[in-house]
Amino acid sequence: MAAETQTLNFGPEWLRALSSGGSITSPPLSPALPKYKLADYRYGREEMLALFLKDYKIPFDLLEKEFLPILQEEPLPPLALVPFTEEEQRNFSMSVNSAAVLRLTGRGGGGGTVVGAPRGRSSSRGRGRGRGECGFYQRSFDEVEGVFGRGGGREMHRSQSWEERGDRRFEKPGRKDVGRPNFEESGPTSVGRKHEFIRSESENWRIFREEQNGEDEDGGWRLAGSRRDGERWRPHSPDGPRSTGWREHMERRRRFEFDFRDRDDERGYRRVRSGSGSIDDDRDSLPEWCLEDAEEEMGTFDSSGAFLSLKKVQKEPIPEEQEMDFRPVEEGEERSDSDSSHNEEAKEPDKTNRREGEKTDRAGAEASEEVPQTSLSSARPGTPSDHQPQEATQFERKDEPKAEQVEKAEEENRSENSLSAKVPSRGDETVPASQQPSTPLPPDTASPLLILSPPVPTPSSASRPVETAAVEAPGMSSVSTEPDDEEGLKHLEQQAEKMVAYLQDSALDDERLTSKLQEHRAKGVSIPLMHEAMQKWYYKDPQGEIQGPFNNQEMAEWFQAGYFTMSLLVKRACDESFQPLGDIMKMWGRVPFSPGPAPPPHMGELDQERLTRQQELTALYQMQHLQYQQFLIQQQYAQVLAQQQKAALSSQQQQQLALLLQQFQALKMRMSDQNIIPSVTRSVSVPDTGSIWELQPAASQPAVWEGGSVWDLPLDTTAPGPSLEQLQQLEKAKAAKLEQERREAEMRAKREEEERKRQEELRRQQEEILRRQQEEERKRREEEELARRKQEEALRRQREQEIALRRQREEEERQQQEEALRRLEERRREEEERRKQEELLRKQEEEAAKWAREEEEAQRRLEENRLRMEEEAARLRHEEEERKRKELELQRQKDLMRQRQQQQEALRRLQQQQQQQQLAQMKLPSSSTWGQQSNTATCQSQATLSLAEIQKLEEERERQLREEQRRQQRELMKALQQQQQQQQQQKLSGWGNVSKPAGTTKSLLEIQQEEARQMQKQQQQQQQQQQQHQQSNRARNSTHSNLHTSLGNSVWGSINTGPSNQWASELVSSIWSNADTKNSNMGFWDDAVKEVGPRNSTNKNKNNASLSKSVGVSNRQNKKVEEEEKLLKLFQGVNKAQDGFTQWCEQMLHALNTANNLDVPTFVSFLKEVESPYEVHDYTRAYLGDTSEAKEFAKQFLERRAKQKVNQQRQQQQQQQQQQDSVWGMNHSTLHSVFQTNQSNNQQSNFEAVQSGKKKKKQKMVRADPSLLGFSVNASSERLNMGEIETLDDY
């Protein structure tokens, strides 16, 4: 990433990608994304703003839980309607004064453009009509430095449309203007370096000139854009030709290809690094997601969306950028860029094998530049590449001027020089600089910063291509070559100037590196320990994206949660590069996110870069020095040889010649032995003052030489000496000596040559041995690789076999399982069929049994119908007889009434006669009259009672009866009051309390005995009355009085007090309290209750025997006893001694109840109540099991029960017949009392089933003991006649 603070786009990349349109000026998407079709309907700015509604409701879909954290209640207004804040206005606009000052100082301002002025197109179309950029604004990279060197004065409008921004929408504000500085504050230096940033754009030289000449201000901008649209992207890229866009400048649009760092192998292309500082421009023109080392640029966004870097203090490029400044790209690569060469892509995988030790992606790019050259040279070793003519023809083909051609050639040679110094292990050697063609440099390119002395490899460096012109050096191919002295001097001077200029340029680079290093160290020292940059952390996620910044607490939490591995690349905001978390923990001695002293910022590879730079410059300096030395020696050697051919040399000259030869041979030996240039370190900065000429005389002059150089050779050799002979002798001696020295020198040279050849042979042998070893190593590795592949193949086959066996076993197991499942399914199906058959058989058996039961039921029904018909016929006969009897009774009553009327008529006549007789006897005296009356009364009483006496007797009897009734009522009321008091006491103690105090309430047995005594008394009284009636012979009067008495006593429903006592006893001790025989505390199931049954039955018999003349009373008593017996049967069971059917049932059940889990008496009483034969069979089967004995028992049970019912019906009919016969034997008053008693009983019994004595009822309803319930279901006994129907007969 560029070293300067680069403006980033605000907003995610996918949003910018989706904003891409189909027009020419729209930005291209990333290569993997498809093109998007334009919408059919597009709206202008005003139309879209008119569609905005403030009161628009939130869509219902957004109200779900997942959208609630990001949901905002109020809609945001469009940005076009929101005015700029002060900070945004300050960021996006420049003041006129600062722009003018910068323009005067030559620092940009858009190359002389007015701030905010439109460039080529009008920006005054309003606040946008297209797809406006709402969020991502750019800002000049060096805003904080006060240098607006990128023409960053374009005024930003929030609603500027895509058309208004042109294809500059993703670039930073204008770059590459005339006065642009390169990171330094010094104006002249930056102006001088201007060419360096653009020299390598061989295809864009016309564009650059047009822009320099100011065409960028007018139509040139537009023309350049349209001219270069078709040639911007590589035609062989996977996505084909691309449209223009991204943040690339118009003048640099052709030169870039993307270098997706982690996707080089997937893509078929990559961006070649451009040389010199123009790489910075390239990087600025690319989106930040496709730049290398994106982690070097960290920062935040302010409220306006502008990017704020955390490294504002860094004004110098990082070492990676310095290396790029130091290494211009070679023309061959530029050519490959334009000629669509795939060589780089084909050789690109080799770079990783050679550059594993380096951490940055820089080395990978360098290797990709060097690999094609290596393969090219290996294809033709020893053959120098005639690259210069190719370049010349290429440049002529592109109509490039000579000056640009020379600049390109020098740029290439310089890059080769840097590369050979950068990679010294490749055996590069230097040759004399005279091999550089002596082309005169144009004055406009003779800047000291642009001249380099190129190294050329010797034939021994077979692994490098010879990139410079293959011109033989003087004195190497033919000794007779005579270079022109002036031309050689001129060329030598030019080369020396080039070398000095390059050294000055390197000195400037070193100064910049040193200042950057010092600045970094000063920054590291000056940052306080708790500085914000030390508290902010960034890390690279597995996708290679940089996340951050995060504070220490967040990073510590995530580290403790286990999200971070030891290999995670992290760095602080103040660090230069990322480091693995494990390395940082080792260096710091603790978890870096925990609190503690923070180490100084990590400088990255600055020291390493500085050392590398020093080694490069030292090696380059040595090479230049050796080249220069060799060139001088060759020149001197050639001149001496030429002079030797013309005239004999003096001894001094011969000595000089021998010394030159010796130096030349030594220098040749040095060069041949120097396979690796020593990395001699020197000072960081070489003085840019002084010349290389100050260094050379001491190294190149011989000690006996008086001149400073070969040009200072003595010119007075022809001067006259003292004497010619002496001079001739001296010359002969000198010639002999010189010849001897020459022979010695030749011998020495031969020895040295042989030594050199031997050494070269030895070196060649060593190289051969090394090559063989490498070949053997390679073969061994290939064999090992082959063996490993074979082993892997064997393992793979073994695994495949194992997998096949496992699959086969699994298949067999699956088949076995399927077979087992199939067998199970068949077995289950068979069992299901068998079960269905059994079910069918059972159903058939049940159907057969059902049919048999239905037949039996039909027979039973026929039998029952026959019995019912017989009973109906008997009932009809009885009804007919009864009707006849009633008719006879009515007839007899009519006769009686007629007789009574006759008697009354006779009595009236008799009374009239007596009154007449009394009136006739009024004449008698009173005494005699009374005496007569008494006598007559006595006589009458003796003879027959008179009517008045009969009436008196009747009245007296009635009065006695009423008194007796009142007395009984008083006793009854007393008993009721006592019972109520006891009940109240029991209620106070709680209704659930079982314990009851022994009260004075009479039991049912005592009440029945008392009633029986009262009935006996009443019968005796009736007998006495009947005797009196018989004595008085007034049967008719007695009958009349009995009838009158029974009518008067209708409340109690009887002629005597017996019914009233019975009714009272029912109130006192109802059927619910009859269970308490002797003690009220005893429950219903106590033993005392069991005695009630037989006693009641005996009492019933006694009552039936003793009350034969009072049928109404006895009938009522019988009903009460029957109800009690039913209760006892229901809860206690029928008396075993009385019922043979029950005894048989119990005997059979005891025999059948083998499991001893059945309560036999309860089951017998329950079965008796079940009427349906089917239910009897079901219950028998359920309780006794589905056996033949149980079925036989049920069948016999039904037969015996039917017989018993028939017998019971017959007995009841006989009893009813007897009762009816006894009823017919009584007089009409007794019959009337019986009917009245039955009616009152039916009215009083709420839970009693009303049944006529003549009709048969299947099942009679009985009362249950309410003490089992815990509460009373009847009305309170305190309230008399509650719930009973009162009739007129009751009064």
Swiss-Prot record:
Basic and acidic residues bias locations: 152-183, 226-248, 313-364, 394-415, 846-898, 958-973
InterPro entries: GRB10-interact_GYF, GYF, GYF-like_dom_sf
Stored CDD domains: GYF
Position(s), cross-link Glycyl lysine isopeptide (Lys-Gly) (interchain with G-Cter in SUMO2): 1129
GO molecular function, a single term: proline-rich region binding
Keywords: Acetylation, Isopeptide bond, Methylation, Phosphoprotein, Ubl conjugation
Motif extent (DDX6 binding motif): 281-311
Composition bias, Polar residues: 371-393, 925-937, 1032-1053
Subunit structure: Component of the 4EHP-GYF2 complex, at least composed of EIF4E2, GIGYF2 and ZNF598. Interacts (via the 4EHP-binding motif) with EIF4E2; the interaction is direct. Interacts with ZFP36/TTP (via P-P-P-P-G repeats); the interaction is direct. Interacts with GRB10. Interacts (via DDX6 motif) with DDX6 (via RecA-like domain 2).
Summary of the function given for this chain in its UniProt record: Key component of the 4EHP-GYF2 complex, a multiprotein complex that acts as a repressor of translation initiation. In the 4EHP-GYF2 complex, acts as a factor that bridges EIF4E2 to ZFP36/TTP, linking translation repression with mRNA decay. Also recruits and bridges the association of the 4EHP complex with the decapping effector protein DDX6, which is required for the ZFP36/TTP-mediated down-regulation of AU-rich mRNA. May act cooperatively with GRB10 to regulate tyrosine kinase receptor signaling, including IGF1 and insulin receptors.
Name of this chain's protein: GRB10-interacting GYF protein 2
Annotated organism of origin: Mus musculus (Mouse)
